C-alpha cells in the first residue's frame, strides 16, 4: 500500500505544476480506489472528466468507484458514457457485477 501513497504524493506534485494533466487525475483516482478512498477517487475522476478530451478510462474508473459506494445509478450513467466513447460494455458490467457481489 505504501506504493499507492507514494504515487498519490507524486501526482499531487505533478497536478500542482499542471492542473490540466488529465492522466494525473486518472492515475491518482486509481491509486485512491486501491486504498479504499472511493469518494476521493470519484473527485479525481470528476476532474479528469471535466478536462478535454473525454477520457473513457475516467468514466470507467468513476463507475467502479460509484459501484463500491453503492451509487448504482451514477455507476450506470458513467458506464453508458464510457460505452458511447468506445468502451466494452461487457467488460465494465463484469467489473460492476463483481463489485456488487462483494458489497
Question: Which residues does each predicted region cover?
Answer:
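Helix-start (N-cap) detector for alpha-helical repeat units in TPR-like alpha-solenoids
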Residues: 22-23, 56-57, 89-90
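Position-specific recognition of the canonical hydrophobic site in helix A of tetratricopeptide repeat
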Residues: 26, 30-33, 67
